[in-house]
Amino acid sequence: MNAIPYFDDSLAPFWPSYQSKVIGVLERALREQSCSRVRRILLRLPWEHDNAFNSRQTWFGMDFIETVSALMNAKPGRDLCWLLTRHPEKPEYHVVLCVRQEYFDGPELDRLILDAWSNVLGFASPGEAAPYQKQITRDVVLDSRSPDCEDILKDLIWAFSDFARDRRGVCDPEARCLAGNPGYPG
């Protein structure tokens, strides 16, 4: 059973610190961005999953987050909230980005994601990266002034339940990790 409410129990067992991280990132976006565009994306690597992928030192997902942050000229810890993990068996990343709605509409965020992933993969043009990224869910606007804000927050927690699964049995350190920037107080 689930110790923290709103997570999809069908995906249990959960790791409590990962549950806290999912909630922390969404609460931070709500607190610091006033009106946040939340998007879940899938980023694929254009080569096969092999031993070279498992033993490499570069974590492409973190390179993507750093590149997105640089391209949007983000103020550290304020303009971008995110979650990131890698699939344990496939060369792909699952990412949640929360950006300020006032700065990024849907098409602008599309371009930002494509530019960043293209840059990380070393492609000459963003169009080359298009087959290797896709939006998994429609954008959700999380606005603290909205009367349905609490319901939207609960829906997002449920939708991102798979990020909080217990990964202790996963061998690859990158796939075992749930990275994010919840900005815990203290």
Where do the protein language model's features map onto the residues?
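Catalytic "initiation/cleavage/transfer" segments centered on a nucleophilic residue
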Residues: M1-C35, Q101-G186
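Signature for HUH/AEP ssDNA processing cores
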Residues: G24-H87
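Short, solvent-exposed polar/charged micro-motifs at secondary-structure junctions
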Residues: N51-A52, E92-Y93, R138-D139
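Short, well-structured alpha-helical interface segments that form or flank functional binding sites
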Residues: W59, D63, P88-H94, E108, ...
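Histidine-centered divalent-metal-coordination microenvironment in nucleic-acid enzymes
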Residues: L80-Y103
